[in-house]
């Protein structure tokens, strides 16, 4: 006679099948460099070239937002030299990072990397908004709600690498 399978075991197996194990290498103790390695591997498996190839990397933790620099209380990081094709440079505000879940960290990291590497801008600036969008792409905000799920991140990340979201914009890096 077969032993009955507990519902919790079945639910856990289904959950494990649904969640991409690719992200299991990241946890609350992972470094910015480990997040970068994941980002690079994710870009490559999404069909993009190595986003760091031939570039100087400068990833670091900053302190509380410097409001004079353009970083505001609803921004968890800042990209630098976005028009410099020889670098990828951005900071993550340490106090935000320490309070974030792994999923929030993924969103923030990919958001800042999107500015620094792909020259992505926010789809809208606050002054341009008349209503909230139907979905919030990675480039929408660098801070997402605490209850954001890995599944939501994976969908948004796929759109991120395909450059497929409403309001996609880029920094203008042409020389005058």
Model regions: which residues?
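Short pre-active-site segment immediately N-terminal to the catalytic Zn-binding motif
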Residues: 91-109
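Active-site recognition of the HExxH zinc-binding catalytic motif
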Residues: 106-120
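Metalloprotease/metallohydrolase-associated module, dominated by Zn2+-dependent proteases
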Residues: 12, 16, 20-39, 48-52, ...
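Acidic helix-start/capping segments at beta-turn-to-alpha-helix junctions
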Residues: 53-69
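Active-site-proximal beta-strand/loop segments in catalytic clefts of secreted hydrolases
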Residues: 60-65, 94-95, 112, 140-144
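Residue-level detector of short, conserved catalytic/binding motifs and their immediate flanks
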Residues: 57, 105-106, 137
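Post-signal/leader-peptide non-cytosolic segments of secretory proteins
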Residues: 60-62, 103, 116
């Amino acid at each position: 006679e077969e032993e009955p399978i507990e519902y919790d075991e079945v639910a856990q197996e289904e959950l494990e099948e649904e969640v991409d194990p690719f992200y299991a290498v990241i946890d609350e103790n992972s470094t910015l460099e480990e997040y970068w390695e994941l980002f690079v591997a994710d870009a490559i498996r999404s069909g993009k070239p190595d986003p760091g190839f031939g570039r100087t990397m400068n990833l670091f933790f900053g302190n509380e937002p410097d409001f004079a620099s353009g970083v505001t209380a609803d921004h968890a990081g800042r990209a630098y030299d976005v028009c410099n094709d020889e670098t990828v440079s951005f900071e993550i505000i340490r106090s935000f990072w320490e309070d974030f879940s792994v999923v929030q960290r993924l969103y923030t990291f990919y958001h800042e990397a999107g500015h620094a590497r792909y020259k992505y801008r926010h789809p809208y600036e606050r002054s341009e908004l008349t209503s909230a969008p139907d979905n919030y792409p990675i480039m929408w905000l660098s801070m997402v709600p605490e209850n954001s799920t890995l599944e939501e991140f994976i969908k948004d990340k796929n759109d991120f690498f395909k450059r497929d979201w409403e309001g996609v914009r880029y920094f203008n890096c042409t020389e005058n």
